[in-house]
Structure formats: structure tokens, C-alpha cells
């Protein structure tokens, strides 16, 4: 799940935001990590990454029970927010099924978030044209990025707190 500020980029982008999948996978980025409201970092484990392996080819590892752990963390963090009960049903399926590629999981989550934000229209075509995945080319530890991306917390913070007004809140 990309940080909420990533979705702000959609709101301020003049025409469209390009999402790239043909880049080399970089570890320790938003491609497989998210920080949720209580400061917990959720990380989707991936199978061994080869040197310069493309982002779209990264496979998810299911050796641990990460899906169950992530869902429990999401529930305990957001269960008292105003819109959790309404939006939880859209996200629970991601924690019940196994998706082979991280690329596909990110795309499905992204499409769901875009659909829920309503004012942002998804123009996504996974694996067609190869222009779809999280583009995180900046150094996520850098001060410069923190000035734009703030605390890097997940879009779920705002979605569960503000519901249908999330888009207005992001602006």
C-alpha cells in the first residue's frame, strides 16, 4: 500500500501519473511495505530476489502467516475509526487469497483504493503495456522525500477516518 501522499500526487498531477513495472526491484520500499496508523510497518515477504529482477516479476512468499498478521494489525489499528466497518470488506479478500506476484497484489489494492476514492479514476491494465506498479525510485530514508511524503503512513489512515471525504482531505 502506497503512502497517502502518493495518492496526493494523483490529485495534483496535470494529466496522469505513470506507474512503472519494468524497473529493477528495490528492497525496503513501498513496493512491499506500508506503515499503518499506530506506527506498525507491514511487510509483504517476497521470495529470493535476483540481481536486477524486474518489479513485475517479484513473487510473494507464503512461508509465514503474514496475511493473518497483517489483517489482525489492520483490525486492531482501525476497528474504532468511523469508516472501518464499511471499508474493511473491500480489503479483507487481499488477506484471504494467495496472489503470486507482488505486482498483481499492489495493482489490485491500488485499484480498490482508487475505486473507493471515487474522484480518482483508475486507468490500470496490469501486464499490458507494463506501465503499472508502484514507482518508488527515491531514497525513502531521505530528508527531501520526507518533506513531500510526510510520515509515509498508509492511505488507509485517511480512508478509515474520513470515508467519502478522503479525497477532499488529501487536497
Tell where the protein language model's regions lie, with residue ranges:
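Residues lining hydrophobic/aromatic ligand-binding pockets adjacent to catalytic sites
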Residues: 1-123, 131-171
